[in-house]
Amino acid sequence: MGQKVHPIGIRLGVVKRHNANWYANPKQYAEYLLKDLQVREFLTKNLKNAMVSNILIERPSGAAKVTISTARPGIVIGKKGEDIEKLQRELTNIMGVPAQVSINEIDRPDLDARLVAEAIASQLEKRVMFRRAMKRAVQNTMRAGAKGIKVEVSGRLGGAEIARTEWYREGRVPLHTLRADIDYATMRAETTYGTIGVKVWIFRGEILGGMKQVMNPAPAEERPAKRGRGRGEGQERRGRRGDRAADKGE
């Protein structure tokens, strides 16, 4: 049966960027990748209440730069910048090179798929009805200016004995259009009945920047229309051939 490709993975290099930008020798690649995973786990654990959406890791020569996209920058920075300085020291110890932390504030969290999925998962863990949580997320996202949204939850919904999947969609979510800016995220809600999976697709419009403009083709030169041989003209030619043959016979 058909399966869906990851909406962000298929758009990398088209309208999406990688979450890690660095180059390494083959011997250093595994080491860098492991440290990236440790950094992401550390930040996800320590900034659980900061509404962190994305973590971008860059490695300029002899240093590291970590950009944290969050809807609550005050929690990350702390009072007089104490928390962010502590974060830099911790990340420097993990990565082994001087680390610089920068904050990217998310202006509209309702248009971020990860934050929307986190909100739904949090409500499910607080025993809010799943239909109410899904509809509320859809309404808030569309009100924030999204072109479309799809929300899917799966598991023992409402404490049912048999797991099932339910989804809501509003607007357009064109997964096959590569220039479409689609944000996608998954989250897990740990409820008393078991784990419930949450998936969110948000269509924020089309990105046309950087694409070659299609010029209008030059009009083709007008050629005289071809005339087909008419029925009478053919009979006249055959008549002339017959007259010439008769002259030769004489």
UniProtKB/Swiss-Prot annotation:
Role: Binds the lower part of the 30S subunit head. Binds mRNA in the 70S ribosome, positioning it for translation.
Domain of life: Bacteria
Keywords linked to the UniProt accession: Ribonucleoprotein, Ribosomal protein, RNA-binding, rRNA-binding
Gene it is expressed from: rpsC
Subunit structure, as described in the record: Part of the 30S ribosomal subunit. Forms a tight complex with proteins S10 and S14.
InterPro entries linked to this entry: KH_dom (IPR004087), KH_dom-like_a/b (IPR015946), KH_dom_type_2 (IPR004044), KH_sf_prok-type (IPR009019), Ribosomal_S3_C_sf (IPR036419), Ribosomal_uS3_bac-typ (IPR005704), Ribosomal_uS3_C (IPR001351), Ribosomal_uS3_CS (IPR018280)
GO BP: translation
A GO molecular-function annotation: structural constituent of ribosome
Lineage: Bacteria, Pseudomonadati, Pseudomonadota, Gammaproteobacteria, Moraxellales
KH type-2 domain ranges (all copies): 39-107
Annotated region (Disordered), positions in chain: 215-250
Record's protein name: Small ribosomal subunit protein uS3
NCBIfam families for this protein: rpsC_bact
Keyword RNA-binding in annotation: yes
Keyword Oxidoreductase: no
Family indicated by similarity: Belongs to the universal ribosomal protein uS3 family.
Basic and acidic residues: bias regions: 220-250
Single GO cellular component term: cytosolic small ribosomal subunit
